[in-house]
Amino acid sequence: MRLQTAAGWRKLLLSTLLCAGALAKKDKPSVKSKKFDFIPQRVQYFDDSDVILFEDGMDHVVYRSDNAGEHWEKVTAAPEGKVRGVTMHPFDSKRAYIITTEKTHWRTKDRGEHWEEFATDAVASIFQDPLSFHAGDPDRIIFNGMDCTGIFCEEVVSSPGPFRDRSV
């Protein structure tokens, strides 16, 4: 094989160096496991990070890992037994919401490092997704709730309400 141009030699040298670098790498992937007494539900990554949230459907609590699942901690902001679900913000990769069975819920703007409480005028709807998001403004969120009197429930909607960042 004759390489008559400088570009040909460069390609050969580059491919040789890439192969040598790949063979010299000693790191192997590591797999770690954690056993829970329940089946984790709705395991969700925050985009572009190693932070994961999941729900414990038996005790109705949320767990968080900031190292791709090697270590887990309960999210203590939301009361145990009251978590209905976790909703990730589809247009802001640092935000998530813990929706409870009551009128008090929690939100994070930093991938779950800190949680802020917010209140709604109704409990979250069981008939549709509790939150709907605006693609262009992460603070414009529609809360779908229910106002129940006796055995009858009426659907209610609020926006932006508690989601608007009041520090601005």
Residue ranges and their predicted role:
Residues R2-V168:
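Extracellular glycan-interacting surfaces
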